[in-house]
Swiss-Prot record:
Name of encoding gene: mukF
Subunit structure comment from the entry: Interacts, and probably forms a ternary complex, with MukE and MukB via its C-terminal region. The complex formation is stimulated by calcium or magnesium. It is required for an interaction between MukE and MukB.
Organismal lineage: Bacteria, Pseudomonadati, Pseudomonadota, Gammaproteobacteria, Enterobacterales
Primary localization class, coarse: cytoplasm
Location of this chain's protein in the cell: Cytoplasm, Nucleoid
Cellular component, GO annotation: cytoplasm; nucleoid
Task of the protein: Involved in chromosome condensation, segregation and cell cycle progression. May participate in facilitating chromosome segregation by condensation DNA from both sides of a centrally located replisome during cell division. Not required for mini-F plasmid partitioning. Probably acts via its interaction with MukB and MukE. Overexpression results in anucleate cells. It has a calcium binding activity.
CDD domains recorded: MukF_C, MukF_N
Region ranges (Leucine-zipper): 208-236
Protein name: Chromosome partition protein MukF
Family: Belongs to the MukF family.
Length: 440
């Protein structure tokens, strides 16, 4: 977990005293990324000054800068990064002039943000969660065993603080990077739609589906492991309740629980927000197609007519069958009044009237249970009623019986929090889950 032992004034005074500052224009940042990439290919993690100059030359060529002053500008860039604590320089009397350079933690952190952390991997996340699960289980076992203060520090607090918490922070960082990627995808989609939305529809669909899939993979992986992680954290919390001197472990467990809840909650919220954006884009595309199709065609036709003698063309057209939009929100249901007289056998009786009659009959029959204070087993009662009606009416009759039954009273077993058993109510696979009503 990210904790600060110093106060805000102390941190401000410390930064001012050490003259901390970072200034990385795009060319300097590119140079730092190039250094990190080349450094990752070396086993010893060290680079000479000549190798840094070669990396700077590649960046300079990419930015189309002059090559006449490459040596001076490379030296200035290297010195500036050493001053900003992005590179460490090591020199020796035996090899004067041949300094060795290594990336500092700050340099690694910046380059890691731009290079490695932007690559989402479900396998990487699964491995992280697997490591966390193992560490939490061992810590929970050690907490239940108990021991002296050294035991709690070494076997419980240390794994939680320096392994579990850091991996949680890494997962949280992955989520925040996914937030940035979502914003970048939104910007890309906006640019595509502003240029030529007809040609951009397929590209927009690809970007939307890829981002949705990545978010869903991330959330599914988190939810699959979330319950087990929370269970082990609760085991540790239960073990510390009888020890007043373990408040530091209890506070850390609470922080980890909050962090895990926040990670899983934001993952689901991020998916919901993206679904809303996905619908917004599709609605925009549909609206654009409805509003713009004739205007675009007319504009292109006028341009083609004006340039016909320079660029002759032939017009082909097809009259395709109309596509009907069958979405529920746009369907208009017809409910026209029927006039005329019909024979008595064909008289129409609305379902509401039948339902009211059935409800009255069932209510009267079920009232006997309340009068006699007899427990009402909803599964048996519904099954008995359904046996009197054809299969096509089973759903409606079952709903009426249940509505009337729950008005009579409640089941005391509902307050225990235990789920009721499923009971079959007909011979076609229908089941009901309800406790016996015994309090009227």
């Amino acid at each position: 977990m990210s904790e600060f032992s110093q106060t805000v004034p102390e941190l401000v005074a410390w930064a001012r005293k050490n003259d901390f500052s970072i200034s990385l224009p795009v060319d300097r940042l590119s140079f730092l990324l190039a250094v990190a990439t080349l450094n990752g290919e070396r086993l010893d993690g060290e680079m000479s000054e000549g190798e840094l100059v070669d990396a700077f030359r590649h960046v300079s060529d990419a930015f189309e800068q002059t090559s006449e002053t490459i040596g001076v500008r490379a030296n200035n860039a290297i010195n500036d990064m050493v001053r900003q604590r992005l590179l460490n320089r090591f020199t020796s009397e035996q090899a004067e002039g041949n300094a060795i350079y290594r990336l500092t933690p700050l340099g690694i952190g910046i380059t890691d943000y731009y290079i490695r952390q932007r690559e989402f991997s479900t396998l990487r996340l699964s491995m992280q969660l697997s490591i966390v699960a193992g560490e939490l289980k061992r810590a929970a076992d050690a907490a239940e065993e108990g021991g002296d203060e050294f035991h709690w520090h070494r076997n419980v607090y240390a794994p939680l603080k320096y392994s579990v918490a850091e991996i949680f922070d890494s997962i949280d960082l992955t989520q925040r990077l996914m937030d940035e990627q979502q914003q970048q995808v939104k910007d890309d989609i906006a640019q595509l739609l502003n240029k030529d939305w007809r040609a951009a529809i397929s590209s927009c669909e690809l970007l939307l589906s890829e981002t949705s899939g990545t978010l869903r993979e991330l959330q599914d992986t988190l939810e699959a492991a979330g319950d087990k992680l929370q269970a082990n954290l609760l085991r540790i919390q239960d073990a510390t309740m009888t020890h007043d001197d373990l408040h530091f472990v209890d506070r850390l467990v609470f922080d980890l629980q909050s962090k895990l809840d926040r990670i899983i909650s934001w993952g689901q919220q991020s998916i919901d927000l993206w679904i809303g954006y996905d619908r917004h884009v599709h609605k925009f595309i549909r609206t654009a197609i409805d509003m713009d199709k004739n205007r675009v065609f007319a504009q292109r036709l006028r341009q083609s007519v004006q340039t016909y003698f320079d660029e002759p063309w032939a017009l082909s057209y097809a009259n395709a069958d109309r596509l009907l939009d069958m979405r529920d929100e746009e369907m208009a249901l017809r409910d026209e009044e029927v006039t005329g007289e019909l024979p008595p056998d064909l008289e129409y009786e609305e379902f509401n009237e039948i339902r009211e009659q059935l409800a009255a009959i069932i209510e009267e029959q079920l009232a006997v249970y309340k009068t006699r204070q007899v427990p009402l087993d909803l599964g048996l009662v519904v099954r008995e009623y359904l046996s009197q009606y054809p299969r096509a009416r089973h759903f409606d009759v079952a709903r009426i019986v249940i509505d009337q039954a729950v008005r009579l009273g409640v089941a005391q077993a509902d307050f225990t929090g235990l789920p009721a058993k499923w009971q079959p109510i007909n011979d076609y696979g229908a089941k009901v889950q309800a406790h016996v009503i015994d309090k009227y």
